[in-house]
């Protein structure tokens, strides 16, 4: 079968690419190995800017059961914790089973052909197009292919756009998504535990409308080297910690636990070549600080669809023409994602740094606000750094001076006067 555009992967990146091609008159199809709705292991948190960025899909997004979270508790390796809050919601919590299905159904309703239970096992780029072969030996042909097939992207690997992930580029995450009748939590608060179980581990609890996602993850390099327990045993230990601190009650449901990997090493150097575009996890678009990937999948998928439409209409599927996809993604999300990797490395390299950040944020409302706004994508990394210096440094220096002065007073045994008094 011959298509103008084939999209491999029916998740948020693939669906957003297809939405840009709806009504174009082009022959477009989505190929996905699963049958929807399908279980998709994922934390399921989306920064609320997604609803502003994709306002045209409001009716689709609002059809998905969603829990809006207004508080975030961030715990450091030492057990110190700070609470972030905002007037509006910080994150929208969804189930990928429902969210992805809603987007894909929107594509179907818009005339996009969707082929489920099709696993692409081979891909060949030629002068006349791209040949894809399924595991059932079914063949598909297209002028252009969008690889939105996730962290283990067949499209990215078989076109030479990346080799195997290095162990320091991916994380292994074990997550449980169970009904809140089994795992009872406060629905208005999400929890994040940086440095859990070691310098390169993290834990999280995300309450959904009727479910909760709770899990532990590690950089794969650290997990293979330093973690001896199996993922589910680690998971149960984390649940015990949450129960001890009265964050959660109830019992784990083993059948709802899944381990998966996600890219946390930053975007690929190139996300296009002759006749090929990449989007979402396949392109490495995951925030290294928050581990959020859905928003970036949607943005990059939209850009991929727009570029594909222009390429087919201009009869130009060369690497040079398709590079506009790289530029569009770089402008909107690429720089942000690379800076998130910088922050990730600084925090995970030394648990004491995380402890210091949490202690400082506990006593400084401005720092709490800035960190929360950065976490939900309202301000850039550069703005965060600048405003942390200009708006919080004076208070921090005063705090340190007062602490030294109090120590000097106790040591001397006399009531020393402050300078200028």
Per-range role (PLM):
Residues 14-15:
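N-terminal Rossmann-fold NAD(P) dinucleotide-binding loop
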Residues 37-73:
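N-terminal FAD cofactor-binding segment of flavoenzymes
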Residues 19-41:
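Glycine-rich FAD pyrophosphate-binding loop
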Residues 309-421:
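C-terminal helical "tail/cap" subdomain of flavin- and related membrane-associated enzymes
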Residues 122, 222, 228-307, 313:
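FAD/FMN-dependent oxidoreductases across multiple families
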Residues 106-248:
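Predominantly flavin-linked oxidoreductase catalytic cores and closely associated redox partners
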Residues 1-11:
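Beta1/beta-strand and adjacent pyrophosphate-binding region of the FAD-binding site
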Residues 52, 79-100:
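Dinucleotide-binding Rossmann-like beta1-alpha1 core, especially the glycine-rich loop
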